[in-house]
C-alpha cells in the first residue's frame, strides 16, 4: 500500500493524464487512508468530473468516508451517466443484503493489518447512494423525468434495508424529489440523523444538465404517483420488519379494565423504550410524507380502490408499461398500514387524521379475504406487520361502531379470518389481540344460532387445541350472558350442549392404554383444551345442571373422565413434567375428580 504522500502526488498529478490512465491511478490509490480529501479537491474540476465521475461510483462506494467525493460526483458528473452507475451499485447491494455486514467485518480486520482504508457498511453505502440520487434526479432536465425516476426508485426499493437510518434517508429522498420541504422539527431523543446532501449541500455547485429538455406537462402527476407508490412500499416493508403492535396497544386502550395490575403493558413499553420510540417516529414520518404527497383520504372509494382489488404484491414491477397515472398502483399492504396508523394515532395520540368511512361488513371482510388468500399461514408469515395493521383496523372500526352497511353479514367467515391471525401470527401479543377480538366479534353477532354455528365449526373442524379451548370459553360466556340477561335463546337450553357434547368432550378412551411417552406428547399437544374442557364440565355439572342433557353424565364419565384420569395419574407419578407442568396436571385431575356427575 503506498504512503499517503505518494498517493497525494499521484492523485494531483495524474489528472493530467488521459482518462483511462487516471482512472487506473485512482483505483490503485483510493484506498490509501487520508487520500479522499485530496481527491475531492481534484474533483472540483467540473470538466474532469464530468468525464470520469460515473466510473468513480464503483471505486469509491466501498470506502468509508467517500460521501464528500461522491456528493461532488453527483453535483458535477454527467447526471444521466452517473445515475445509471448509482442504480447499478444499488442493484449490486441488493444482492449482497445483510450477509455482507459479516464480510465487511472480516475485510475490516484484514485491511487494518494492511493499513488500508476502512470499508463502508452496506447500510451506509445505501444511504450514500440514496443521497446521490436526490441530487442527480433534480439535476436531470428531460421531457420525461419519470423514465429516470421510476427505475431509480425500483433500485432503491430492491436495496432497501428497513433500518431507521436507511428509512430516514429514503424519506429525505422523497421529500427532495417531491419539492415539499417541511420546516425542521424539534429534536427528540427518538430523532434519526443521516446525511442529506441535497438539502444541506450547496446547490449552486450543481452543474447544468448538458442534454436539458423541457419537461412534459403530464410528468408532475406521474412523478407524484411514483413517489406515492414507492413510499407505500417502503411503509409496508418497514412495518413487516419492525413490530408496531398496533392491535395489542389498541386493545389496551379500548379495554383498560382487562389489563392485569402490575403487569407491563405494550403501551408502556412504546412510551419508554428508546428503540420502540424511534420505531413509532419513523412510521409517523412516513405517514406525514404520504400526507405531503397528497394521500389524506380514508374514504370507501380510496381504500377499496387499493386494498380490495385483486392482489398486486409489487406495484412498481411494470414500469416499462407506464403510460399514465392509472398504470401506477399503491402498495396494498402499505395502504392498509397507513389506514391502521390513522386509526391508531387518532385514538392513542389524539392526532388529526382522516376518519375511516369503512365498515367491518363488507369492507374490512373483503380486505381480510384478499390479504389472507388461499395460503394464510404463508401470507401472515411474509407480512406480519400488515396482519397486525388489518387487525388494528378491525378493532378501530368495531370501537367506532362501524359494523355494517348491509344485511349480508358473514360473521363466520370474518371470525375465521381473525382466528387464522390468532394461530399463525409470530407475535404472541398480536395473537392474543386477534383471539380477544374474535371473541368480541362472536358475541356481536345478533343471531344466536349463527353464534352457535361458529362455535360448532371451531370445535368440530379446527385442528388447533388453543382455538378449541377458546371456543369452550366463548360458549361458557354465551351461557352466562343468556342467564344473567334473562334471554331465551339456544344457549339457555340443554339443546346446545346436547348438540356439541362430543366435540366438547371427545372420546379419549385410548388415553388409558397409552404408554408414558405417548401420553406425555398427547397431553402436551392438548393440555390447553383439556384444562378448559374440565373447567367447563365443572361449570355445567356443579352449577348449571339444568343445561346437562339426560344421560350425558354417564357417557362423559366413560369416554372422557375415567380414561383421562387414569392416564394423567400415571403421568404424574412418572415425574415426566416440570414444576409448572405438574401443577397443571394436578389441577386437571382434581377438577375431573370434583365433577358432580352422578
What are these regions (language model features)?
Residues 1-262:
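Long amphipathic alpha-helical scaffold regions
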Amino acid at each position: 500500500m503506498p504512503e499517503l504522500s505518494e498517493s497525494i502526488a499521484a492523485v494531483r498529478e495524474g489528472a493530467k493524464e488521459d482518462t483511462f490512465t487516471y482512472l487506473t491511478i485512482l483505483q490503485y490509490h483510493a484506498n490509501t487512508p487520508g487520500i479522499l480529501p485530496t481527491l475531492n479537491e481534484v474533483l472540483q474540476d467540473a470538466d474532469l468530473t464530468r468525464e470520469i465521475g460515473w466510473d468513480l461510483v464503483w471505486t469509491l462506494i466501498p470506502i468509508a468516508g467517500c460521501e464528500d467525493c461522491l456528493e461532488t460526483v453527483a453535483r458535477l458528473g454527467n447526471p444521466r451517466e452517473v445515475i445509471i452507475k448509482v442504480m447499478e451499485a444499488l442493484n449490486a447491494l441488493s444482492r449482497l443484503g445483510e450477509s455482507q455486514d459479516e464480510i465487511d467485518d472480516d475485510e475490516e480486520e484484514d485491511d487494518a493489518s494492511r493499513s488500508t482504508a476502512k470499508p463502508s457498511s452496506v447500510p451506509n453505502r445505501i444511504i450514500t447512494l440514496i443521497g446521490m440520487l436526490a441530487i442527480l434526479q433534480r439535476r436531470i432536465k428531460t421531457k420525461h423525468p419519470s423514465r429516470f425516476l421510476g427505475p431509480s426508485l425500483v433500485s432503491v426499493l430492491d436495496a432497501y434495508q428497513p433500518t431507521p437510518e436507511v428509512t430516514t434517508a429514503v424519506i429525505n429522498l422523497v421529500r427532495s424529489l417531491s419539492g415539499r420541504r417541511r420546516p425542521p422539527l424539534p429534536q427528540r431523543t427518538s430523532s434519526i440523523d443521516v446525511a442529506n446532501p441535497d438539502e444541506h449541500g450547496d446547490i449552486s455547485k450543481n452543474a447544468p444538465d448538458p442534454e436539458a429538455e423541457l419537461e412534459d406537462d403530464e410528468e408532475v402527476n406521474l412523478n407524484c404517483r411514483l413517489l406515492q407508490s414507492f413510499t407505500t412500499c417502503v411503509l409496508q416493508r418497514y412495518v413487516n420488519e419492525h413490530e408496531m403492535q398496533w392491535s395489542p396497544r389498541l386493545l389496551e386502550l379500548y379495554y383498560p379494565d382487562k389489563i392485569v395490575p402490575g403487569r407491563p403493558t405494550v403501551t408502556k413499553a412504546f412510551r419508554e423504550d428508546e428503540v420502540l420510540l424511534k420505531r413509532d417516529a419513523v412510521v409517523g414520518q412516513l405517514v406525514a410524507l404520504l400526507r405531503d404527497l397528497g394521500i389524506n383520504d380514508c374514504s370507501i372509494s380510496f381504500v377499496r380502490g387499493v386494498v380490495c382489488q385483486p392482489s398486486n404484491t409489487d406495484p412498481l414491477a411494470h414500469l416499462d408499461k407506464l403510460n399514465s397515472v392509472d398504470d401506477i398502483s399503491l402498495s396494498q399492504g402499505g395502504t392498509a398500514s397507513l389506514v391502521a396508523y390513522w386509526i391508531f394515532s387518532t385514538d392513542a395520540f389524539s392526532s388529526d387524521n382522516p376518519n375511516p368511512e369503512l365498515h367491518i361488513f363488507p369492507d374490512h371482510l373483503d380486505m381480510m379475504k384478499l390479504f389472507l388468500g388461499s395460503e394464510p399461514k404463508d401470507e401472515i408469515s411474509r407480512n406480519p406487520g400488515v396482519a397486525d395493521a388489518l387487525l388494528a383496523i378491525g378493532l378501530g372500526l368495531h370501537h367506532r361502531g362501524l359494523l355494517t352497511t348491509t344485511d349480508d353479514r358473514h360473521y363466520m367467515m370474518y371470525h375465521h379470518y381473525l382466528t387464522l391471525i390468532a394461530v399463525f401470527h409470530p407475535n404472541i401479543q398480536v395473537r392474543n389481540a386477534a383471539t380477544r377480538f374474535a371473541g368480541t366479534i362472536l358475541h356481536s353477532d345478533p343471531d344466536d344460532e349463527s353464534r352457535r354455528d361458529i362455535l360448532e365449526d371451531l370445535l368440530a373442524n379446527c385442528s388447533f387445541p388453543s382455538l378449541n379451548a377458546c371456543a369452550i370459553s366463548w360458549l361458557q360466556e354465551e351461557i352466562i350472558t343468556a342467564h344473567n340477561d334473562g334471554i331465551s335463546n339456544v344457549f339457555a337450553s340443554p339443546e346446545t350442549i346436547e348438540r356439541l357434547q362430543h366435540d366438547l368432550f371427545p372420546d379419549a378412551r385410548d388415553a388409558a392404554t397409552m404408554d408414558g411417552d405417548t401420553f406425555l406428547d398427547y397431553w402436551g399437544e392438548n393440555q390447553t383444551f383439556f384444562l378448559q374442557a374440565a373447567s367447563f364440565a365443572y361449570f355445567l355439572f356443579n352449577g348449571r345442571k339444568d343445561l346437562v342433557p339426560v344421560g350425558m353424565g354417564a357417557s362423559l364419565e366413560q369416554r372422557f373422565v375415567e380414561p383421562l384420569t387414569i392416564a394423567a395419574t400415571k403421568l404424574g407419578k412418572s415425574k415426566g413434567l416440570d414444576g409448572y407442568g405438574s401443577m397443571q396436571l394436578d389441577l386437571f385431575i382434581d377438577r375431573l375428580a370434583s365433577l358432580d356427575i352422578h
